[in-house]
Amino acid sequence: MLGQSIRRFTTSVVRRSHYEEGPGKNLPFSVENKWRLLLMMTVYFGSGFAAPFFIVRHQLLKK
């Protein structure tokens, strides 16, 4: 009895909730401004690419 009422409650909550739909609405960042998106992606991927080079430089200069 209790399980059925809990199941009915959770399905009604899910049914009543509404999320924005459309391209880019389910992402954790905004895709509205293409230049800001370009800058953020460049920083994100550029830092991952540059990190090994900076680590090697640091190790070579360390003595």
From Swiss-Prot:
The chain crosses the membrane at residues 34-60. Component of the cytochrome c oxidase (complex IV, CIV), a multisubunit enzyme composed of 14 subunits. The complex is composed of a catalytic core of 3 subunits MT-CO1, MT-CO2 and MT-CO3, encoded in the mitochondrial DNA, and 11 supernumerary subunits COX4I, COX5A, COX5B, COX6A, COX6B, COX6C, COX7A, COX7B, COX7C, COX8 and NDUFA4, which are encoded in the nuclear genome. It is found in: Mitochondrion inner membrane. The gene is Cox7c. This is Cytochrome c oxidase subunit 7C, mitochondrial. Gene3D superfamilies: Cytochrome c oxidase subunit VIIc. GO terms for biological process: mitochondrial electron transport, cytochrome c to oxygen. The lineage of its organism: Eukaryota, Metazoa, Chordata, Craniata, Vertebrata. Residues 1-16 form a transit peptide. Residues 61-63 are mitochondrial intermembrane. It comes from Rattus norvegicus (Rat). Coiled coil: none annotated. Belongs to the cytochrome c oxidase VIIc family. The modification N6-succinyllysine is found at K25. It holds the Pfam family COX7C. Pathway: Energy metabolism; oxidative phosphorylation.
